[in-house]
Design a protein with these regions (language model features):
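Hydrophobic/aromatic pocket-lining and membrane-interface residues
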Residues: 1, 34, 76
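Acidic-leg catalytic submotif of subtilisin-like serine proteases
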Residues: 30-42
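Solvent-exposed, charged interface segments at domain starts and junctions
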Residues: 11-25, 86-99
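A short, structure-level motif marking secondary-structure boundaries and short turns
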Residues: 14-17, 60-62, 138-139, 170-171
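A charged helix-plus-loop insertion that forms the helical arch/lid used to bind
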Residues: 1-16, 63
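Second-shell residues forming the walls of enzyme active-site clefts
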Residues: 68-196
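Active-site-proximal loop/short-helix segments
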Residues: 1-3, 40-60, 64, 86-107
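Glycine-rich anion/phosphate-binding loops
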Residues: 13-32, 65-71, 115-116
Length: 196
């Protein structure tokens, strides 16, 4: 059984080299097992910072510190690539700070843009194949969730210079209901700049 990503963060706190090695191995095993069953892509790694109170992110987050998240996600990505699978960072620009679960309600992050820089840094630093946007409203930039925000997707493309695939999070989640039914969700995400 693969460990929760938070376990890799705990290993990091004691031994950084061991944590990098473990993350690389986890990425390889995850990708190799999925590919052996015909699955060629996994929405991993979670790049959200572990602020503590978010139960939905919980132990899926590597660590509280952005630099540690970057190091462990990079090692995990190396393992994924060694087994022939791409990486998809999520949940852009960061879901770890808010407590509500976007599967069942609509989270709002009221921080200033400057306060979000640690959350955004992994997307600047990592060589990701894909990015999944979050069903969270970040009032500092837009009143739409990141999935439905041409401002956030534009920032990802133009400022961060990400040129891979931009995915929505699951459009059946409650956090996606802000724009109406499924057809509106698909059209709004596509018009905001999401690829899939």
């Amino acid at each position: 059984r693969l460990p929760a990503m938070a376990m890799l963060g705990k290993i990091w706190d004691d031994d950084q080299d061991a944590a990098r090695g473990a993350a690389r191995q986890v990425g390889y095993v995850l990708a190799a097992e999925l590919r052996s069953r015909g699955v060629d892509y996994s929405f991993t790694p979670v790049l959200d910072l572990d602020y503590g109170p978010s139960r939905v992110i919980g132990d899926r987050a590597f660590h509280r510190q952005s630099a540690v998240v970057i190091a462990l996600a990079a090692a995990l990505g190396e393992g994924l690539h060694l087994a022939g699978m791409g990486s998809c960072g999520k949940h852009f620009p960061g879901h770890g700070y808010v407590i509500p679960d976007s599967h069942v309600e609509l989270p709002v992050d009221d921080r200033a843009f400057e306060a979000m820089q640690d959350d955004i840094e992994p997307y600047r630093q990592l060589p990701l194949d894909g990015v999944m946007a979050a069903h969270v409203i970040y009032n500092c930039i837009d009143c739409n969730t990141a999935v439905f925000s041409n401002k956030w997707i534009g920032y990802l493309r133009n400022d961060i210079k990400f040129n891979g695939v931009v995915f929505t999070d699951d459009l059946s989640m409650a956090g996606a209901g802000v724009v109406g039914g499924m057809l509106n969700r698909v059209e709004t995400a596509y018009n905001a700049g999401c690829d899939m």
